[in-house]
């Protein structure tokens, strides 16, 4: 059962759930908290790689990722990031989120943006118990027109679901947690699997 607005506010008030900066009441709906777009992005560079062998030797996968992913792009305030049709880009939420070990979060895109072709997450919308950091957004433009995305715009909504008990292996205590304390648009770390 997901938390309702009253429960979200209670969890925020007593510090079990932390969202920084804390969202005002107007951004907390019946079962969700609206999140905004941050100013950090990462895209695929122009490259000549025919493919990335995801099950190949780790050093080759790592080198391929290094060749195709851009450095982090920090957008100045007021500027737009343009996502063209058929393009994938990574970005982050403006808000940082800290979940306790007995709560899982879910990220959903906004219907109004989806109706223009914008996917906010390609597949990864679960936020693990014990997570701490900003949420990476996996943007894909499936529409026909370029989309101008501006830092600070409402980009998605988080919902929260209590677990049956505390997780034995929350994200913040896992040795293999590849994105622990993530603050920027971190590229894939599939080579760390």
UniProtKB/Swiss-Prot annotation:
One annotated GO molecular function: dCTP deaminase activity
Gene3D superfamilies: 2.70.40.10
Catalytic activity: dCTP + H2O + H(+) = dUTP + NH4(+)
Pathway given in the UniProt record: Pyrimidine metabolism; dUMP biosynthesis; dUMP from dCTP (dUTP route): step 1/2
Matching Pfam families: DCD
Cross-referenced InterPro entries: dCTP_deaminase, dUTPase-like_sf, dUTPase_trimeric
Segments for region (Disordered): 169-193
Catalytic residues as annotated in Swiss-Prot or TrEMBL: 138
Domain of life: Bacteria
Keyword vocabulary terms for this entry: Hydrolase, Nucleotide metabolism, Nucleotide-binding
Signal peptide extent: none
Gene Ontology biological-process annotations: dUMP biosynthetic process; dUTP biosynthetic process; nucleobase-containing small molecule interconversion
EC number: 3.5.4.13
Residues holding dCTP: 110-115, 128, 136-138, 171, 178, 182
Oligomeric and partner information: Homotrimer.
Family: Belongs to the dCTP deaminase family.
Biological role: Catalyzes the deamination of dCTP to dUTP.
PANTHER family associated with the record: DCTP DEAMINASE (PTHR42680:SF3)
Name listed for the protein in its UniProt record: dCTP deaminase
Origin organism lineage: Bacteria, Pseudomonadati, Pseudomonadota, Gammaproteobacteria, Enterobacterales
């Amino acid at each position: 059962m997901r938390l309702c607005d009253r429960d979200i506010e209670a969890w925020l008030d007593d510090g079990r759930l932390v969202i920084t900066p804390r969202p005002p009441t107007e951004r907390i709906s019946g079962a969700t908290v609206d999140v905004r777009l941050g100013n950090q992005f990462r895209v695929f560079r122009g490259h000549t790689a025919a493919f990335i062998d995801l099950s190949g030797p780790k050093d080759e996968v790592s080198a391929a990722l290094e060749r195709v992913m851009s450095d982090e792009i920090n957008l100045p305030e007021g500027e737009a990031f343009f996502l063209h049709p058929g393009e994938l880009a990574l970005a982050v939420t403006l808000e940082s989120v800290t979940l306790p070990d007995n709560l899982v979060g879910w990220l959903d895109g906004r219907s109004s943006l989806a109706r223009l072709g914008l996917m906010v997450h390609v597949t990864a919308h679960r936020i693990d118990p014990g997570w701490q950091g900003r949420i990476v957004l996996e943007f894909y433009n499936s529409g026909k027109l370029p989309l101008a995305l501006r830092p600070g715009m409402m980009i998605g909504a988080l919902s929260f679901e209590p677990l049956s008990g505390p997780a034995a292996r929350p994200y913040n205590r896992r040795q293999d947690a590849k994105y622990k304390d993530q603050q920027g648009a971190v590229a894939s770390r599939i080579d760390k699997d």
